[in-house]
Amino acid sequence: MHSLNQKIKAFSRDNLRKQCTRVTTLTGKKLIETWEDATVHVVETEPSGGGGCGYVQDLTLDLQVGVIKPWLLLGSQDAAHDLELLRKHKVTHILNVAYGVENAFLSEFTYKTISILDVPETNILSYFPECFEFIEQAKLKDGVVLVHCNAGVSRAAAIVIGFLMSSEEATFTTALSLVKEARPSICPNPGFMEQLRTYQVGKESNGGDKVPAEDTTHGL
């Protein structure tokens, strides 16, 4: 008993090995959770980071490109940073709706960058006009446009679904099905899904393509 008491008194939290938990969210984000001073710290992994806990290199590449139309593609930042893959798909335009992802080949392609946060509170509808205009411009020039975000499952998918609802007069259900067939991993966050349903209601009630009045500001 005396020996046990000594060990308890000598115990120090500093002697514990630092633990970290890797978490992949429904939207495809990879996070690192660490404990420090009885508090959980969450950090998003950096593709170019080191091997330490908190910033780790993600070596898993997602190079699957969803071909929605011959001129409309959907993918991740990995696809957008693979020059050989882009040339294979004859990409001419790239719509980057990621947050904090740089455009890799400025001299090779026509870029449009719109930083969108992948959280349910973000007003995705307010970005539709600018995104749709860029896609239409690429189409009119007989180009091929790749729409991408970080993981290519939430933000970019929501933009493409909305575009099909706008330009192809597709219903939300039909557009979602078409995009999921081309890229099975898509999973727009719950807020985006609800806004896309609202977008359909607005189109039906307005008889056109207007964003509902309450959704015209950028929400975070």
Curated annotation (Swiss-Prot):
Q: Which reaction does it catalyse?
A: O-phospho-L-tyrosyl-[protein] + H2O = L-tyrosyl-[protein] + phosphate; O-phospho-L-seryl-[protein] + H2O = L-seryl-[protein] + phosphate; O-phospho-L-threonyl-[protein] + H2O = L-threonyl-[protein] + phosphate
Q: Which SUPFAM superfamilies match?
A: (Phosphotyrosine protein) phosphatases II (SSF52799)
Sorted UniProt keywords: Acetylation, Hydrolase, Protein phosphatase
GO cellular component, alphabetical, reads: cytoplasm
Q: Which residues carry this modification: N-acetylmethionine?
A: M1
Q: Does the keyword Metal-binding apply?
A: no
Instruction: Tell me its family.
Output: Belongs to the protein-tyrosine phosphatase family. Non-receptor class dual specificity subfamily.
Function, as annotated: Has a dual specificity toward Ser/Thr and Tyr-containing proteins.
Give the protein name, as stated in the record. Dual specificity protein phosphatase 19
Q: Which organism is it from?
A: Mus musculus (Mouse)
